[in-house]
Regions:
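Catalytic core of pol beta-like nucleotidyltransferases
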Residues: 1-23, 32-36, 48-97
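Short hydrophobic/aromatic beta-strand micro-patches
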Residues: 44-46
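Conserved histidines in hydrophobic membrane contexts and catalytic metal-binding motifs
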Residues: 26
């Protein structure tokens, strides 16, 4: 299945809210409108209240289960500045607290 950005928002928002993340932005092929059946979902997360790796693992699992697709979950705190500047032009906000 190839999701629309609105479908991605509908799946991600309740999960993000339940975990207390500050924001989620879509990047990669879905954000650029180039997704195929084989595309994974690339999400940049500002963790907000999330501090433990265990809870981040739960967030990852719930999003992956929601999308039924491979997922690339990157945190703003864990990504280097060069990577963030490279994806910034393609980012699409999908959740903001």
């Amino acid at each position: 299945m190839i999701y629309t950005i609105e479908q991605i928002r509908q799946i991600a928002r309740p999960i993000a809210a339940a975990y207390g993340v500050r924001s989620m932005r879509l990047f990669g092929s879905y954000a650029r409108g180039e997704a195929t059946e084989d595309s994974d979902v690339d999400i940049l997360v500002d963790r907000g209240k999330l501090r433990s790796g265990f809870v981040m693992g739960g967030l990852y699992a719930d999003l992956r289960d929601g999308f039924q697709k491979d997922l690339d979950l990157v945190t703003t705190q864990g990504a280097d500045a060069e990577f963030l500047s490279r994806i910034r032009p393609d980012e699409v906000m999908i959740y903001e607290q």
